[in-house]
Amino acid sequence: MSFLTTPKMLSEYQCLKNIGFSHKTVLKRRLFRKECTPALKSFYSTQDPALNEVRTEKLKNGVTYVCDPRPGHFSGLGVYVKAGSRYETKKFSGVSHFMDRLAFQATERTPVGEMKAKLENLGGNYMCSTSRESMIYQAAVFNDDVKSMSKLLAETVLAPKIQEDDLVHYRDSIIYENSELWTKPDALLGEFAHVTAFQNNTLGNCLLCTPDKVNGITATSIREYLKYFYRPEHLTLAYAGIPQEIAKEITKELYGHLPSSSLPPLEAIPSHYTGGFMGIKKSEAPPVPYQQEFTHVVIAMEGLPVTDPDIYALACLQFLLGGGGSFSAGGPGKGMYSRLYLNVLNQYPWVETCMAFNHSYTDSGLFGMFVTILDDAAHLAAPLIIRELCNTVLSVTSEETERAKNQLKSSLLMNLESRMISLEDLGRQIQTQNGLYITPKEMIEKIDALTPSDLSRVARRVLTGNVSNPGNGTGKPTVLIHGNVDEVGDVFALCKKAGIGH
């Protein structure tokens, strides 16, 4: 057994691998870690269970922070900003995409070289991503480096250095990213499904900065974006594995000085589900490095927001349908007994991919299926999807319900074993649910309570267009076709005949 994996170190080594630490970093930190302060040493100690409860507090200026103090070998830090593509007006369209390019680069106080050196010396894992409803900044570090990483995180969120010279490089990378999207059908379908389902509003705003808008993004527009969205009341901080008193101290030190914003609150525009059709013929798509021989079809309906009581039933329904690619290594927990594997992928060799999806947001959602099918069989894609969707209303057995519940629970709990994922769950719950945090135990109890009739009921509610969300959606199907558009046929007529949508 190597030095890195002696029994004494095994648990820490495994944990570090899970969040992306390298072998060199583990060894370096083991041999050369500086002595921890008494407060930071307590991260590893067993504490009173009452001290391990998740707590939330709001500063006077509006900054909210939440802390899960349960100790571990490393700690998680996150900043979640109420920003993203759904909040973009015409003036700020595409700016969110530039924000993740600016993360962990030069700041007003730290040159880019020094920033990179500090991050490398910390040896942690850090990231920034843009979603439709949030800008996410996260890091996982050793416990004795929490304060150092917190300062770098605050710098990159509050004071990124924005220079026109740097934007030239970011524009090129964003244009390249847009071109790459056309070579990844899964990502392409997900993005265009939102654009079609919520046309010209909120969740339908493109997550990427489109090529026609790239050159219009300037240093001035980014600074205005920062001023408008990065206000104290829009910031939610999350801490995992950090004692409450240290989390409070860090928050007040780094964010307590921010003045309350004098700007008016963001206009609360509800997400209006429109449904609709988008067809992309091969001749209309940009050229790709290979000849596309598949047609991709999506059929979706308005889903449920994260606060809807039926959200667990709909998530379970997604696992019941399941699906995936035509090739799978198999094995326990792979979903090989889900309906889409049994009824579609294992039956029809001309189906490359068939999968159910479920996206939930603060006030709406998107639920449906997509299939990737050989061009010669394109006319069979829509009937396949509609058949499987309708069967969830007609019949759901106890056996497949229990299987789907177990898969949902295992997926939830295994994901939460990751420090970064549990951190995001903590921060995003507080941000999207007005400070409410639902524990994993409570989620499991809600999943356990589901019955086959619950799944059929929520399937009927969604597929018939009877979802009542704040945006008063149309209840019409969303249909997206990429490939042999004409061969797929009249999908709306098939949906109407099957009773899907209004």
Curated annotation (Swiss-Prot):
InterPro entries for the chain: Metalloenz_LuxS/M16 (IPR011249), MPP/UQCRC_Complex (IPR050361), Pept_M16_N (IPR011765), Pept_M16_Zn_BS (IPR001431), Peptidase_M16_C (IPR007863)
GO process annotations (BP): protein processing involved in protein targeting to mitochondrion
GO molecular function, one term: metalloendopeptidase activity
Spans traversing the lipid bilayer: none
GO terms under cellular component: mitochondrial processing peptidase complex; mitochondrion
Keyword field: Mitochondrion, Transit peptide
UniProt subcellular location: Mitochondrion matrix
Subunit structure: Heterodimer of mas2 (alpha) and mas1 (beta) subunits, forming the mitochondrial processing protease (MPP) in which mas2 is involved in substrate recognition and binding and mas1 is the catalytic subunit.
Purpose: Substrate recognition and binding subunit of the essential mitochondrial processing protease (MPP), which cleaves the mitochondrial sequence off newly imported precursors proteins.
Family, as annotated: Belongs to the peptidase M16 family.
Protein name as it appears in the record: Probable mitochondrial-processing peptidase subunit alpha
Organism: Schizosaccharomyces pombe (strain 972 / ATCC 24843)
